[in-house]
């Protein structure tokens, strides 16, 4: 095994879902910037980046979220950094957002845009993504998990612990974030939370199914 391969595998063995962090140990600005950049630079279906990363630093807001975030009880108060990843709603070919991406960011030639839109529409139809608002949001949320995984992996490579969390009351958390002007509910919904910091205690040994049970060669 090469040194790079060993570094990668060691990082994955190091990473675990940290339930409680050492509140005295802080993730540096430069390390956290790197973690956020790996999220921002992550791949997404059709390169549409249907996400937003909200860094929660306000302690009062954390306290408001806590009663409705049963999966983040210890993490909210002990993690050095706490992020809520939002998924974008109604990402369709004719939406203002997608038009911004294909015209303003990707800068497709005007003559090619109708073909791009047709391809996008066909893809969403074939996968039943555009069946309704819920299926559109579920698809966007899938993309946020790609960014989430990359952020946690980069953190592990930096020796930083993390914990992803779905354990929250979606409606109440959305309501609180909207009241605090953190999220525009017309365009976004909370997808997943993730905390970063340094473990308070050493975890139990990692347990996974053997490779032959989860990998199949055809």
UniProtKB/Swiss-Prot annotation:
State which Enzyme Commission number(s) the record gives.
1.-.-.-
State the GO CC annotations: cytosol
Which domain of life does the UniProt lineage start with? Bacteria
One function term, GO molecular function aspect: oxidoreductase activity, acting on other nitrogenous compounds as donors, with NAD or NADP as acceptor
Q: Which CDD domains match?
A: NfsB-like
Name the cofactor(s): FMN
Any one biological process term the GO annotation gives: 2,4,6-trinitrotoluene catabolic process
Keyword Oxidoreductase (UniProt) = yes
Q: Which Gene3D superfamilies match?
A: NADH Oxidase (3.40.109.10)
Q: Supply the enzyme class, top level.
A: oxidoreductase
Matches recorded under InterPro entries? NfsB-like (IPR033878), Nitroreductase (IPR029479), Nitroreductase-like (IPR000415), Nitroreductase/BluB (IPR050627)
- Keywords linked to the UniProt accession: Flavoprotein, FMN, NAD, NADP, Oxidoreductase
Member of which family? Belongs to the nitroreductase family.
The record ties this protein, via PANTHER family, to: NADPH NITROREDUCTASE (PTHR23026), OXYGEN-INSENSITIVE NAD(P)H NITROREDUCTASE (PTHR23026:SF125)
Protein name from the UniProt record: Putative NAD(P)H nitroreductase SH0546
**Species this chain originates from:** Staphylococcus haemolyticus (strain JCSC1435)
